[in-house]
Amino acid sequence: MALRAKQFDVARQLAGEALKSNRSDRNAVMILAHALIGLGRTDEAITPLERAAKRNDDPEIETLLGHALCGVGRTPDGIAQLRKTAARRPPYLPAFQELAGQIANCGDIGAAVGIMEQALALAPASVDLQLDLGRMHLRNNKRGEARRVLTAARSAAPGRTDILTELARAALLDGAYAEAADTYRHALGLRPDDLLSRANLAVCLMELGERGSGEAALRAVLRGRPHMLGRVALAMATSSRGRFFFRPSAAAKFLEREPERVATP
């Protein structure tokens, strides 16, 4: 419970007490490691994870160990551990996801795509793998491939807002503004409080020539949420039909002003 609530220090203390009674308590080791990583003390998580990995034939422990090793700058060791875990059969899919992410962070996104494709070949029905592969294609600037994979994921899980927003983003980046707008509307119908999707929908509307509707949508995003000013101003600036302001105060002044109404004769 403490770990889920992100009360990392409480979780660390509870796990430590459990390990005093039973040093081989696998669940306590996992909780302790996650808590230490959450506290920014990843280096302290490595030794208990290494000991647990030697005692247990456990891919979850091995994957977290690989993550921790990469997190403290021991990236070659971490990737080697993750490759070893990914080679297990039956496959442990989170190891592929972690391995692909770490390799992508090293700059070899093409290799990361290959790892995700390998994982998907082992578990073709996994929607989560399809989503991760689509995201990886976007990082590799392969927008068409991303849209193809994410469209398949949407067909398999039409109610997943994370898939819908990623597919919409791929369409937006690919210049398919009408498709992106429709997909963002679908996602917002399922999760109306997604402010980032509302801002991106506004960009789509402006690109489609609906500048007034787009700016109205951005005003709605900003209203009562001053912390969203940077994102809203960026949305206006990145649109080819948007507006650019040199000062945040100028953007705020424009967005806080209601648009003038045209008098009807």
Describe each PLM feature range:
Residues 4-13, 39-51, 72-84, 105-118, ...:
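Structural signature of tandem alpha-helical TPR/SEL1-like repeats
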Residues 20, 53-54, 87, 121, ...:
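Structural signature of alpha-solenoid helical repeat scaffolds
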Residues 23, 56-57, 90, 124, ...:
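Short coil turns that delineate tetratricopeptide repeat
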Residues 31, 64, 98, 132, ...:
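Canonical tetratricopeptide repeat
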Residues 55, 195, 199-230, 252-259:
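TPR/TPR-like (Sel1-like) alpha-helical repeat modules
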Residues 103, 202-208, 229-246:
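TPR/TPR-like alpha-solenoid helical repeat scaffolds
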